[in-house]
Amino acid sequence: MAQFVLGLGEVAAADATRFGPKAANQAALGHAGLPIPGGYAVDAAAYWIQLESLGLMDSVRAAATAELFEDARQHISRVRISLFDEPIVPEVLEPLLAARQSLVDRFGKLLVVRSSALMEDQAGSTFAGQFESFLGLESEDDFITAVRACWAALWASRARQYMTHHHITPADTAMG
């Protein structure tokens, strides 16, 4: 079974192609002996598994290939709403909840969830401010909602416009 959630101290967590550059850079700094906040990285494969389990791949492709935003809007809405409203598959949810509990046990109730898209911080684009970060999360529900919101942020209008400007589509990338 694939590991979808890894501690930042694990060597594999420094893989930006799986976890996105934000998480991978945090992991690499920790591996170099620099102090980092404790945390976990979510594999972008978890995002794809969630999309597939919800039957959203046709909407993903349709939104990505639409030439006009107006043509993509209904598909984007379906993806975003489904990511918020439909259950997270157990193979993804269980390690997320285990990681959350580990953080609560180590650091207390207030947690942070940050997005880490695979294409962030590439040459010529930073994506600064395009996605989401959530601070002060206390409950399990808030934590899971924040993960969902990070996944859905890949489909936000501002992010899509930025990606279009840089010749990227949400179907070509994923969110860790």
Where are these regions (language model features)?
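N-terminal beta-alpha lobe that positions the nucleotide/phosphoryl donor
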Residues: 1-176
